[in-house]
Amino acid sequence: LIIIEAMIPFFVSFEGRKPKVRDIVILAVMCALGGTGRAAFFMLPNFSPTMAIVIISGVAFGCEGGFVVGAMSMFVSNFLMGQGPWTPWQMFAMGLVGFMAGLFFSKSGVRTKNTTKLGLCIFGALICILIYGGIMNPASVIIWQPAVNRSMIIASYVTGFPFDVVHGTATVIFLWLLARPFLEKLDRVRIKYGVL
């Protein structure tokens, strides 16, 4: 319940911007890409383009847009992967990834020229392991254990680290391949149609 309540300010902030239909449509497309990207790679645990798409969305559309794409991508993809008590945690963690991408990289009108592929890849790997893994690893203990202690939390970080590395590697690969073409197209759409 606390995680769900923690997401409310982000969604209220987005709604406070009074988004137009065209803003919502482009964010919905990015959410659909994130959700289907996760479903398309379901046979490879933790290897999907979802985090890369969320980071790209945060860079292209700012903090609030990145949060919305991250949170909704996890919500939508969990209709295929399975909804459960982990869904709000995943939504919050991935939304935070999109928010932080917007915070670190969206400083100018044309964001493509100021964002390097290498910088995005390093950011993607670190945020995947430190933020997403840092939230989801202990969440696996908090969700299922009635009495949580420090050794359980440490064990969740240790056992989750290899999966975080795989997830971070996938994020780096997909950012390396997709960041530049996606950001160029999204900047073009943003400038031409006045999106976000």
Model-derived features: where do they sit?
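Membrane-interfacial loop-to-transmembrane alpha-helix junctions, especially the N-terminal start
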Residues: 21-27, 64-66, 182
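Membrane-embedded alpha-helical hairpins and interfacial helices in multi-pass inner-membrane proteins
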Residues: 1, 43, 48, 83-89, ...
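Membrane topogenic helices and adjacent juxtamembrane segments
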Residues: 1-30, 111-112
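Residue-level signal for alpha-helical transmembrane segments in multi-pass membrane proteins
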Residues: 10-12, 80, 173
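Alpha-helical membrane segments and adjacent membrane-interface helices in multi-pass membrane proteins
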Residues: 30-105
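Short, mixed-charge, low-aromatic patches
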Residues: 7-14, 53-58, 132-137
